[in-house]
Each structure stands twice: as C-alpha cells, then as structure tokens.
Amino acid sequence: MPEITSYTYAHRARLVKPFLSYDLSAFALSFLPAAGEEVVSPAPVRPGPDDRASRDDGYTYHHLRRDVFDMARAGGVDIESRYVVPSAHITLGRYLSHEDHGTPEARRAWVDKINQINAWLENEVWNNHGCGFIGEWIVGQERGLDARCGPLWYGMGRTICVGEGF
C-alpha cells in the first residue's frame, strides 16, 4: 500500500487553473492538468527525487490516475469510480435540499455568482503570482495519496494509509 500512497513523491503531476464547477448535487473547486504553465508552488523540501515532472509537465495527472489505477487493480482492488470522466476536484459542498435554488431566479443568481468567482480566478489568480494565492496543486505536495476503503463519495469510507508528501 505505501508504494501506491507515496507514488506522488517521485511521480509529480501538476494541476492548474482552479475554477468552480457544479452539477445537480454539489459544487467543487476543479483543476486542469498542467501543460507548460510556469511553476508557482514553493520548491519541495530536499532531499528529493529529480523534480523533472513538475517542471516540464511530461507526467500529467492523467498518467498518475492511470498508474495508480493499474497498481491498485494489480493488487486485486476492485475500483468503482463515481465519475466516468477523470476529474481533479475538491468538493466544497453538497446540496441538501432544493430550497436555495427553488426558482429560476435563484438558480440564475447562483450560476451568475459562480461565473463571477471564476472570472476573478482567471483574471487575478491564474497568472498573477503576486496576488497571495497559488493557483496550482502539485499532487502529493504536503502529503501523499490517501488510500481509503468503502464508498468514498459523500465523505464516507475510512483512511487505511496516507503516503509521504514532499
């Protein structure tokens, strides 16, 4: 298990351009795989492996997902994903009822606010290194992957092992 949870220590994938996304059940902070954007995260603590992956983005989030999936399956783990399309996101909240978005006007106001925040992220955070926010996420920075068992969505399941961060 530690081989999988600490995999990001030597296989670093960068995610950039944070934006709010939503569907019928929740909203999240989502990211895109890096494709040559300037690295703005602080350097990892040494000693560490050659950090080529997070410098040239040759190893992407999609590679990481594939590799971890393959290792888990090779170990006999049956994986049931909630989403068919790969997604890099942090769920911020779930809708518990339809009260707050019960009218077309309320839904429009919600979407307008999300669009306003996304415009701010794009204009003020994505390429503005002096704004006080870091608009990227190097997977494994600070802590490794979190291996969990049981249904993982909606905060369920439990942690079995957390990998080494950098």
Can you say where each PLM-predicted feature lies in the sequence?
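Histidine-dependent nucleotide/RNA phosphoesterase domain, centered on the 2H-phosphoesterase fold
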Residues: 1-166
